[in-house]
């Protein structure tokens, strides 16, 4: 018996990996976060599969379902939104699986920041503008951020920021970043990237909060901050330069 942690991707059913889809179809038990994983993803499960929405369950209850499946020698598809390695809370589940000597696998998924970049139609790593992306969040009701990982510190890098779980914390986001990025720094607020009701709000650090408040969007969004969001000044990369030689493009 094996528990398969599966990244469902950002939302669109056709953005799940083939491996993820096939594992959901093959497992007799499917546990999924109903608040974040669309019904179309869960529909890949077999008709006779036991499908359980874990949104109202705590960790002990989720593990109880897994232990029941283990006792019945039934594989489990544990479906998480996005990529399970990012804010998927799989760490505590893995710790318990190891204690119970239950095998597990992890199938990656398309992460939210990649879906947001696609929705915006841009590259996040432009030469001379930004070559670094920091994936982070802010602390509200969730666990505290480790020392040194607050936005005031991360902002000193000037890197492009992909800020998760912070739709209701834009006041702090803007307050902490304006000293490092400037009030005119572009910001994109992407609500439910790749879902049918996806919304994109563009602004700057000085006005994005008011724009989001006016749209009455308070959850399930990612905030991108950086100059890459609004520039045509980037130089071309060296990758395709005529004088750039490598083993597959020898001189002449």
Regions of interest found by a model, annotated:
Residues 26-27, 96-103, 127, 208-217:
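Structural recognition of alpha->loop->beta junctions
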Residues 1-110, 115:
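Class I S-adenosyl-L-methionine
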Residues 2-5, 61, 72-76, 132, ...:
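A contiguous loop/helix-start segment that scaffolds small-molecule binding in enzyme catalytic cores
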Residues 21, 43, 68, 124-126, ...:
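Short secondary-structure boundary/capping segments
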Residues 1, 12, 83-157, 199-202:
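Class I SAM-dependent methyltransferase SAM-binding "motif I" and its flanking Rossmann-like core
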Residues 15-20, 38-39, 63-65, 121-122, ...:
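A generic local structural motif
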């Amino acid at each position: 018996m094996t528990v398969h942690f599966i990244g469902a991707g950002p939302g669109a059913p056709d953005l799940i990996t083939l491996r993820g889809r096939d594992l959901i179809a093959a497992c007799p038990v499917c546990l999924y976060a109903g608040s974040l994983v669309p019904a179309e993803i869960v529909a890949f499960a077999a008709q006779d599969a036991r499908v359980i929405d874990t949104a109202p369950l705590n960790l002990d209850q989720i593990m109880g379902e897994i232990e029941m499946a283990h006792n019945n020698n039934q594989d489990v598809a544990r479906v998480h939104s996005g990529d399970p390695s990012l804010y998927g809370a799989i760490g505590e589940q893995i710790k318990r699986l190891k204690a119970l000597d239950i095998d597990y696998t992890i199938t990656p998924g398309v992460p939210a920041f990649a879906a947001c970049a696609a929705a915006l139609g841009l590259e996040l790593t432009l030469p001379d503008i930004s070559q670094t992306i920091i994936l982070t969040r802010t602390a509200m009701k969730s666990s505290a951020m480790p020392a040194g990982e607050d936005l005031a510190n991360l902002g000193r890098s000037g890197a492009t920021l992909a800020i998760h779980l912070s739709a209701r914390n834009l006041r702090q986001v803007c307050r902490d970043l304006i000293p490092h990025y400037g009030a005119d720094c572009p910001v994109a607020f992407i609500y439910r990237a790749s879902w049918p009701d996806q919304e994109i709000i563009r602004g700057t650090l000085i006005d994005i909060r008011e724009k989001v408040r006016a749209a009455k969007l308070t959850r399930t969004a990612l905030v991108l901050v950086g100059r890459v969001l609004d520039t045509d000044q980037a130089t071309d990369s060296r990758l395709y330069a005529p004088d750039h030689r490598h083993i597959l493009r020898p001189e002449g």
